[in-house]
Structure formats: C-alpha cells, structure tokens
Regions:
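Catalytic phosphate/metal-binding cores of nucleic-acid and nucleotide-processing enzymes, i.e., regions
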Residues: 29
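Lipid interaction determinants
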Residues: 1-25, 35-208
C-alpha cells in the first residue's frame, strides 16, 4: 500500500509545559569535512569539522549556522569545540558541547528500523516545522507565527510492562505530527500528511 496523502482528523488537545524550560531548539541540516590535525590538541588523525544550518530556530527568525571541530573522547563521547553568535549577547562566542551516540533500535517484531523526516513550510501562515524519527526516537519543533512547540518521544517500557511510545517532553501548545511516525508502513518519500490545519511533506523515508 502506498499513501500519497494522509489526514489525521482526531487530535487530543494536551497543554504543553512552560516555554521557560526551553533554552534553545532548532532543526535543519549538517555537513562534515575533515581538517588537518590540530597540533594544539594532541590528535593524530584528521578532525571532523561539522557545520549545522538551522532551517528553524527558536532563538532566531532568519537562517543561522554554527560550526565546530569534533574530538573523540576515551569514553566514547565526542567533544565539540566551535563558535557562533550568542543569542543573549549577539556576539560571536566560543562554546563546547559533549555528544553521545544512541542506538537506533527497532519497534517491530521483524526488527525493522525506520528513519523519517516530515517538513512544514507554510509561508502564508508563517509556519515552519520539522519532525524526525530515527529508530526508537521521535522529536520535532515547529514555529507557528512566532510560537514555538517542541516534542520528544521514546520507545521504551511503559507502566504496563510492555514497550510503547512515551512522550518525554512537550513544550508549547501547537500540534506536531509525532504520532504519525509511529506507524510509517505505507508512507513514502514525497507524500504528504495533513495534521491539524497544516500539510506536512514526507521529505525522507528509509528502513533497514
């Protein structure tokens, strides 16, 4: 079965948490190149240099980029060192972030793993958004006429002792089609999903 468009007609209104809990949210694309070894950091191999383009950003209305060098750590994490404009000061500022990889597990008996991207770009209503699923994780962000909404879901043991999707975070009061990605069978790249008042485009869909 192939679905060109899907309409979700029932949406349960669940108030979100206070936006004061969101320090920063963004979504977009990233690219990586290798740079020569930095002698000041005692790294023998070329260092990955990553650049993130923020297509949607809770702190800015226009496009934003940040970039940094990625240094593998002995415990398996990766230390990112870079610089970007500090939203609080408007000045270019150095920063450090520590990253950790997570497994992209399966949610089905056949051990199939899914990766999907939904994108919203409604210029008439000043609405932009992106919802992404990788394996057992779904999260998204939307900016609707200046209002920010974010959600995160994880496939984990529920209170009933069985695996199920659990919402870990919801801030803001608009609607994100996270639940649509729980059952992607029949969806295809290039299709559309109507959720609430908006049509979301299925930009990417993979399974392995």
């Amino acid at each position: 079965m192939s679905i060109d468009s899907l309409t979700v007609t029932t949406i349960h209104i669940i108030p979100g948490g206070p936006m004061s809990r969101l320090q920063w949210g963004f979504a977009g694309t990233s690219s990586t190149t290798l740079k020569q070894t930095d002698p000041n950091n005692n790294v023998a191999e070329p260092i990955p240099h990553c650049k993130w383009a923020h297509w949607i950003d809770s702190q800015h209305d226009g496009p934003v980029t940040d970039e940094g060098d990625m240094y593998p750590q002995p415990d398996g994490t990766v230390l990112e060192k870079g610089s970007m404009v500090n939203p609080a000061t408007g000045l270019m500022t150095d920063y450090e972030e520590l990253w950790m990889d997570l497994e992209s597990g399966s949610t089905t008996k056949d051990e199939m793993r899914w990766s999907l991207v939904l994108s919203l770009d409604d210029k008439l209503n000043r609405a932009k958004g992106m919802v992404i699923r990788v394996g057992e994780h779904v999260q998204g962000i939307m900016k609707n006429d200046g209002r920010i909404t974010v959600e995160r879901w994880v496939w984990e043991d529920s209170r009933l002792g069985v695996k199920d999707w659990t919402r870990k975070v919801r801030l803001g009061d608009d609607f994100l089609p996270c639940s649509v990605l729980f059952q992607p069978e029949g969806m295809h790249s290039g299709g559309k999903v109507r959720y609430g008042e908006f049509w979301w485009a299925i930009k990417e869909l993979y399974h392995w």
